[in-house]
Every structure is written in C-alpha cells, then in structure tokens.
C-alpha cells in the first residue's frame, strides 16, 4: 500500500507529559529509563505493586503491556507472560481499573503497549477516553501500519495521548523520515530485526540508526528490543540515544521469582539499570 502523503498527522500545539519528561531529562543529561512489564503477570494486584516499585527505583516512564492471545511482535518470554496474564483473568477493562486505582500514586508517564484488535473490540474512542481519564500518556500499537495510523492518530491525540510509532533497522529511509517526524512523544527504535527478547550483544549499526534519526527528526529516540544488561544500557547511552526500553529482562525476572519476592527483585534490577543509565 502506498503512503497517503496528502494525509497529515495532527500537530500537537502543547507539550505532552512524555515530551516534558524527555525535556526534563535532557536538561540533566540523563537517559530515560523505561521498563516494560505485562499487566496481570502474575496477577493484577502484584502488577500494582511492581508499578509503584519501578517508579520508586528510578524508572522515568513505564510501558505496560495489555495481554493478547496472538502477540506477533513478541518473543517467547513476553508471549508466556501474556499467556499467564490471560490465565489470571486479566482484561483490558481490568488494566484500566488498575490504573484508575493508582492515578494519585503514579506520577511518571504510563505508556500502554497493545495490539490493535483489543482496542478495536473495545472501541477506539471509548478506549482513549477511559485511558485518558486514568492518566495514560502514550500508546504503542505494534501491528498498526503507518497508513492506518494516519486515520486513528487524530482521535488518539484529541485525548492528549501520544501515539508512538516504531522504526526498525529494515525501515526504508524515506519511510523512516515520515515515521520519525510524525510520531508523538518519541521514536521507538527497534534495535534488531525479529521479535522481542534478550540478546547477548548490541549490534553496532544501532549507533548509526540513532544518529540518522536524530538528524532527520527533532523527536527523542528510545531504543528497545534485545536490551537486557547494564552493559547494553550503557552502550545505548554512549551512542547518544534519549531513552532505553527494557522488556524481556524485567518480564523474565517476574516469571522466575516467587510471588513474595517478585516486587523486591524487580526493584533491585531497576536500580541496576538506573545506575547503568546514569553512568
């Protein structure tokens, strides 16, 4: 499908909560630390505790996954996490209720990561209205093509929610320019081809992609997929990224910890990543 270049994404006239967070961090020369966890794994009550612990231990933003039965962009660790969350009875409605209960306690931007089908079934406008009321700042929909994003971005933006778009190493240059200049909040740079998951090393081409994105767009660049160690985080910082997203490494620790220890274990790992981000 050809890109509809006549259609424009809406232009935000005011800074969003995510914009303000990145500007605040840039002034302090800090890398934005963004953990990802799956809502409802192991259960909604523990997710609530983990969110507050991540905020306490230095997360600047949090990406919260909505469990879905067919998560195409996710590797086995996050797929299993989604499966556990669904088995525990987690629904999109539960997640909205969870965030409502934490609205006065969570002060950092919360970004929902969801596939499009759950949102479509819920109703996009209804979903955005409820998400906005409970303090959601951003939305990532990995299976929403750019051509479809044009249609929905205006509705999403009207509720003061940033629709965050993804760029991959295989994205053609012209399309990369369109995406990075029309994303809201930041550009999500997928550091590897394929699905999410831990990797042993970061590919050096990521540095070139960060530089390229910063040359063609004023939006911050956050790197995700495959980042699992303090060394990875430190490398991303040295390469000049504005933020780092860590998913599978957090999710794996949730799955490997018993319920009594999981919150503290996640807090300790978040502290490690915070130190690496600040070095």
Swiss-Prot record:
A Gene Ontology term for the protein's cellular component: cytosol
Reactions accelerated catalytically: (1S,2R)-1-C-(indol-3-yl)glycerol 3-phosphate + L-serine = D-glyceraldehyde 3-phosphate + L-tryptophan + H2O
Pathway where it operates: Amino-acid biosynthesis; L-tryptophan biosynthesis; L-tryptophan from chorismate: step 5/5
EC number, as in UniProt: 4.2.1.20
Pfam families (alphabetical): Trp_syntA (PF00290)
InterPro entries: Aldolase_TIM, RibuloseP-bd_barrel, Trp_synthase_alpha_AS, Trp_synthase_suA
Keywords from the named record: Amino-acid biosynthesis, Aromatic amino acid biosynthesis, Lyase, Tryptophan biosynthesis
Gene Ontology molecular-function annotations: tryptophan synthase activity
Active site: 63, 74
Family per record: Belongs to the TrpA family.
Its job: The alpha subunit is responsible for the aldol cleavage of indoleglycerol phosphate to indole and glyceraldehyde 3-phosphate.
Record note on quaternary structure: Tetramer of two alpha and two beta chains.
Protein name: Tryptophan synthase alpha chain
Gene designation per UniProt: trpA
